[in-house]
Amino acid sequence: MQQQYPFRDIEQQAQQYWESNATFTATEVSDKPKYYCLSMFPYPSGKLHMGHVRNYTIGDVLSRFHRMRGYNVMQPMGWDAFGLPAENAAIKHNVAPAGWTYSNIEHMKGQLKSLGLAVDWQREIATCKPDYYRWEQWLFTELYKKGLIYKKTATVNWDPVDQTVLANEQVIDGRGWRSGALVEKRDIPQYFMKITAYAEELLADLDKLDGWPEQVKTMQRNWIGKSYGCEVEFPLAVGNGTLKVYTTRPDTLMGATYVAIAAEHALATQAAKDNPALQAFIEECKRGSVAEADLATAEKKGMNSGLFVLHPITGEKLPVWVANYVLISYGEGAVMAVPAHDERDFEFASKYKLPIKAVIKPAHGELELPLQAAYTEHGILFDSGDFNGLDFSQASDAIAAALAAKNLGKRRTQYRLRDWGISRQRYWGCPIPIVHCPSCGEVPVPAEQLPVVLPEDVVMDGVGSPIKKDPAFYETTCPSCGEKATRETDTMDTFVESSWYFARYASFDAHSSMVDERANYWLPVDQYIGGIEHAILHLLYARFFNKLMRDVGLVRHDEPFTKLLTQGMVLKDGSKMSKSKGNTVDPQELIDNYGADTARLFMMFAAPPEQSLEWSDAGVEGAHRFLKRVWTAVANHVESGIVAAFTMGDLSAELKAFRRQLHQTIEKVTDDYGRRHAFNTAIAAVMELMNAYAKIEGHDATTRAIRQEALENIILLLSPIVPHICHALWQALRPGTQLLDTRWPVANKAAMVQDEIELVLQVNGKLRGSMTVSRTLDKAAIEALAVQQECIQKYLAEGSVRKIIVVPNKLVNIVVG
C-alpha cells in the first residue's frame, strides 16, 4: 500500500466498482425497512455549483449511513428540465432549448457522478421528456373533468421581461422571482388549479409533520392564512344590488365611514365609464406592485368613485373610494373602512380628510380623542347603539346576528390562499392538453392521444412562443366531433413538474400509469433535503399534488415528505456565491485539485447543515490534510501487518482510556448522523479520536489489535462522508471484504465503562489534591485511602479527623479540628 494519498486513482476505482456492480440499485423486494432519501432535483443549468455539492452530499451521507444501518435505501436523481433559462440561453447561443438542456444534463450528470453519490441512476428522470410529462397531462385532464382545474379571465401578475404570467407565490416584493422586473397586472384567460379546495386539509395536516422545521410550517400556515370573520353586504344607494366585503373585525362595523374597493372591482369599472380621471387612476393602480408587503408600505392613494352605499345597520350613506391598498384577490376585493381601528384606513382617511369615528375603547381606561393613530386592539364598544358595552366576542356575534336577520351578512371562514394559476405564455414547458373546438368548446385531450408532444426542433427569435406561430403544432381536429380545431398553446407552470416527481422515481418505468403500486412501498419520502427558499412554493404545491394523486387513487398516504431538512447557503466573503458578484468557486476545480472526498468533508465539517456555510480555502486544505493523515495511519498499520482476529489481553490504563474514547465516539457519531444531523460535530469527534490514536505507543499484539479495531471503526464512521478513501482503506484493512456490505458499528457498552475514577480531595472544604481509585471501591476503603495520601498527611497534624464526607464519584472532604 503506497504511503501517498492517491485521491484521483482511488476515487475513479471506487466509482467504477460501484457502477459495474450496480451497488446502489434500489429494489422493492427486501425484508429490510425502507428508507427513501431525496434531495431536491437540480435545474440543468450546465454546471454544478457549491450549493448543489452541499445539498447532494447531505443526502448522500444520510443514504449511506442508513444503508449501513440495515435499511433498504433509495436515493434517486433527475432533472427539473423545463423553464425559462433554457429559452434565454437558446436565444443567446442560437440553439434549440431542448439541445441545450440535454447537453447540460449529460455534463452535470458526469459532475454528480464524480462526487461519488450513492444514486440509483436507472431511476433518472428528465421532466422535459414526453414519457414524464404525458402523465402530468393525464392528471390535468382528470382534474379538469372533476372541476379541480378551470379556466377564467383573471387579473394576473405579468412579468414584462420574461413575458409571462407569475403565480402570487412567484412575486417577491413586487418583482418577478426570476427576472427581478417590476410586475404588472393584466387580464388574461388562465387555467387554475383549485388548491383552495384543499386549504383546510393543507393547513390541518401541517400538525402531522413533526419532522419539519417549525419555521417552514409557520410560513405555510401564514400563506394559507385562515381567518374567521363576517361577510357584510352594503346596499347600493342608487339602484339594486349590494357591495360585499369580508372583515375579520365585525365588532368595528359601527365605525365604518367609507368603503374602499380595488381598481379591478366591477363597481370601479362602472364608475369610471363617465369619469376619465378615475379611469386614469385605475390604470395607474393596475400598473402598480401586487405584493402585499409592498401594499402595506406603499403610499396610500385613492379617488372618490362618486358612488354611495348604505350602512347595513344604520342606513347612513357612505362614499365608495377606489384605493390602491385593496387587493382584488383577497375577500371580495372591497373593504369596509374603519379608520379609527385600522392603520391603513387611518392613514388613508387622514390623507383624504375622511371622517374617523371611534367605537372601541380599552376594557380598562378611556380612549384619548381625537386619535393620533388607529386603536387596533380588542376592547369594549361605545357609540355603537344597541351594541354598547359588548366586548369583541359578544359584539362580533351580536352584529353577525343583526346582519343575518336583515339578510345583509353571515359568518364566514376565509383563506388567504388563492387558486394556482398554471398557464404560462412560454414555449419550453409541458403543453396544456386542451383542444379548442368551434362547436364543442374546450375539450380535454383523451388519454389514448397523450402525450401532446412539445416540438423540440424550434427556432427561438426572442418574441413570444414558437408553438403559437407553428400551425403544425396548433392545427388539429376535435377529439369529440372531429371538426377542425386548435390546440392550447400555453404551457404549464414548471412548478407542476416538481410537484410530483418524488412519486415518479418510485415507479420510474411504469408505462400504463402515472405511478404504480411501487409508489406505495417507497412513499412517503423519509428524508427530503432542500433550501428554505422553497418553503412555500414547491413544498406547498408538492403537498397539494400528493393529495390530488391520493384522491384519484394513485397513492395511499396523505403527505409526501416525513422529514424535511433545509440546508443553508454557501457564502463567500459573507454573501451568497453568484456569478454577478464574482465570488463563485467551481466545484470541478475543487474535485480536480483535491478530490471529491475533500470537497465532501469540507462541506460537512464547515457548518451544521441548516446554517449558512462560509467558504474557506484554508478549510479545504485542512480537510485534505486530515484525509492524508488517515491514509498514512492505515498505510503504516498495514505495513506492520494487519490483525485478522482480535486477541486482546489485559489492557493498560492508556489503552483502556483510548478504547473507551473509541466506543464513546461510535455512540456520538451514530447519534450525530441519525438523530441530530450534526455532521460537523461527528467529524470533530473522529478528528479527536485520530489525535488520541497518534499517541498510542507499542507494537505488541494487544496494542496492534486495538489499533486495528480503531482504524476499522474510524473508516466505518467516516465512510458516509468520504466514501472513496474509505472504500480503498477498508480493502487494505480487511482484504476480500467490501465496506458497503459491512454493518454500522455498535458501541461496546462494557468498553465505555470507566474502571477507575478520579476523586477530588478536600480538607475542611479546601482543595488539597486528588486520587485515582477503582470504581468498585466501597466507602470505608475510600476513606482509609484518602487519609493516607501524601497531599493530605501534613494537614492531619493540625488536629484530629472529626469526620470524612464521601460524595460518590466526585470528592472526599476530610473535616479536621
UniProtKB/Swiss-Prot annotation:
GO molecular function, one term: ATP binding
Motif 'KMSKS' region, residue numbers: 576-580
UniProt EC number: 6.1.1.4
Keyword field contains Flavoprotein: no
PROSITE patterns hit by this protein: AA_TRNA_LIGASE_I
Subcellular location(s) per record: Cytoplasm
Superkingdom to which the source organism belongs: Bacteria
Top-level class of the enzyme under EC nomenclature: ligase
Keywords in alphabetical order: Aminoacyl-tRNA synthetase, ATP-binding, Cytoplasm, Ligase, Nucleotide-binding, Protein biosynthesis
GO biological process, any: leucyl-tRNA aminoacylation
Reaction catalysed by this enzyme: tRNA(Leu) + L-leucine + ATP = L-leucyl-tRNA(Leu) + AMP + diphosphate
Intervals of motif 'HIGH' region: 42-52
GO CC terms: cytosol
Binding, ATP: 579
Family: Belongs to the class-I aminoacyl-tRNA synthetase family.
Name of the protein in question: Leucine--tRNA ligase
Encoding gene, per UniProt annotation: leuS
